[in-house]
């Protein structure tokens, strides 16, 4: 009887065991049930953007400096030196850069996907309930624009030299479907569109952006 009781208890507890979320994760309905959930989602995006494959190194002072030939040290470890030399010569297909470039591309689109998840869920929210909703929405648009812009400038042609060239996939939705690849001009237009939406949402955010002169200049240049 004891054995059967133990088996019944184990099987009965199976469903509740499987319902337990991994540490640091929440079901989507719970994640976005209040403004704090949206804040936490944005914190998660920023934490991912701070990884060494993105703005924690590669897109701040690592890979981008190698491309600009601003980083060369004869005392650098040999395994890193071959990466630097390949980047100095813009050899994107060099096997030594394959892992790093794959990480930049993959992590950036992961963050874009997270931003899209925030944007899709926040569409169901009454923004008047809390002023932070509009700010969060603006931040998500800004993140999406910024990441696409950096991918475009790193992995696409110079629009001034090749205006009709192909651009990059521009991700608007939180799903696993293949994303549409836009032309270079269309890609930049998409970025400017997201920046315009971000600016409208952040119009009351005077703490971080007391002047719109910089963004107005960039849009005018586009």
What are these language model-derived features?
Residues 1-12:
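Sec-dependent bacterial lipoprotein signal peptides
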Residues 42, 112-115, 188, 195:
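Inward-facing hydrophobic residues that define packing positions of alpha-helical scaffold repeats
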